[in-house]
Structure formats: structure tokens, C-alpha cells
């Protein structure tokens, strides 16, 4: 016999969220897995002798939320605490809409912002990785790497690129960014154009990229896992994370991600002297302030300014 959680409990509220359209309509399986992982972890947390899952929702106030964040930060990391609170905000917002809670204490907690990720690919790593993908018989991943870098786009928008997005007469790729809904128009670059012949038009679908082992379009999970396998095979190194340290004070490291190609491309465009308007048109950012996180590796804007002044 299934034992249902007390209807007043946090566990019951999480069940309500998981039954909601907000949760069931999440497209990416990896996003759902991430949310489930954070919720599974936090529901088991004990503070003041009581498990979070068994607490009444009415007992979870601003003071408790602060204690919960500090507990997760101390037990795991700031990163984990921040991401857990992102999910708990969604759960409590659904509770507000369903009339099961009166306020969202997790929205009130001012969580510290972590340093922006500044991981970059080198040009040699890009060229080497593309060559390795081709040699291993996976040109689809090679072309996605080139397109992520040269188009300065997120992997999801490259992975789901269709032949119909590319205007055969003008050579311009027209698509809508999935995260922002922004309409993009980017002329196909020479390097991408030179690789399109490596990919076949299929009757089954219109996607440019298919996983060679199945002949079917990449899912988000397949793309991420297979990129990691190829990256490890090629030997992409782990790199230090700017301004982030482990509990013992040692430097925190990270693998290089496919998503880091977007930052690399935008930074390269900035170093090449592109204006804010040009960078916004290329990246899809809505305002120049959002570009600041991409201007990494050496005060690019100030250097460009002094070059234009003739001081460098």
C-alpha cells in the first residue's frame, strides 16, 4: 500500500509540483533529472532535528530558508545551495498558484552570486578537437563545435539546427533561440559552409546533425555524453575556475564544455574590435550589460580602446 505524504508537508508540496504542467512540460530530460536530484537531496536534510520533507509547509519561513541555504552551503557547496534554491522557488511558486502556500520564502533569500564562468577554448583545441571527431568518424560533432564557436550560439540551438533554417539563396541561417525566443539571422561562415557537405539530408527529419551510430537527431543527453566521451578521448584538459575554491582552499577545476565555445566566440569577436551592437546581433543578447561576462582574458575593451587611441 502506497503511503501518501501528509497533505500539509513539504513532501506533498513537491508531489504537487511534480504533477503540475510547470514540471511535466519541461522538455529536456537532463533538466528534469537535475531538478529531481536537487529535490531528492534537500528533502532528506535535517535541521533542528526534523527532516525537511516532513515539515509542514507553514513552518518553512524566511528564517528557516536562510538556515537551509547555509546548511547546504556548508554540507556541499555554494553552487549546490544556489541551484537547490532555484528549484525550491519553482516548487513554492507552483504552491502559490495552487493555493497551497501563502508566500515564497525562497524568493526572499538574497543568495550570493558566484563568479561568472570564464572557461575558454584555445584555437588549437578547437581545431584539434574537430580533427579528432572527424578521424573517429563523427563529423557531426566536429561541425557542431565549429558552429557553436563561429555562430556564438548555445549548443541547443546548434544541435537542433535544420536545413530549412538556412536560406539557400542568401546563405543566411534564420532561427529562434530556444532559451530567449530571440529571432536570429547569421550568415553561414566559410568554415561551416565547407563542412555542410559532410551531412546528409534525411527523409525522416530536417535536422542537419544526426548521431552517426543511430542516424537519428541528437538528444540533449546524447549530445552531452558523447561530447564528453570524445573530449576525454582527445584529451581536453581540466582548467581552473576563476575565483572558485574548494573547502580546503585549493583551486577548483572544471572540464571544458561544449557550451564554453559560445563564450570563446563572443570573446574572440570582442577582441577583434566588434562593437556592442555587432556582438548583440551575433550573440542574441538584449543589452550590452549582459556582454560583460564574455569580455574575459585581459580587459579586452580597455585594450581595444587604447589601441584606437594609438597607445598600444
Q: Model-derived features: where do they sit?
A:
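Basic/aromatic DNA-contact patch characteristic of tyrosine site-specific recombinases
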Residues: 1-8, 24, 187, 233, ...
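Basic, Lys/Arg- and aromatic-enriched nucleic-acid-binding interface segment
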Residues: 78, 82-84, 97, 101-102, ...
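C-terminal catalytic core of Y-nucleophile DNA break-rejoin enzymes
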Residues: 178-197, 205-230, 257
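C-terminal secondary-structure termini that scaffold catalytic or DNA-interacting sites
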Residues: 212-215, 308-312
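Short, basic (Lys/Arg/His-rich) helix/loop patches that form interaction surfaces
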Residues: 50, 131-141, 186, 202-205, ...
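Short, polar N-cap/turn motifs at the start of nucleic acid-interacting alpha helices
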Residues: 165-172, 252-255, 272-293
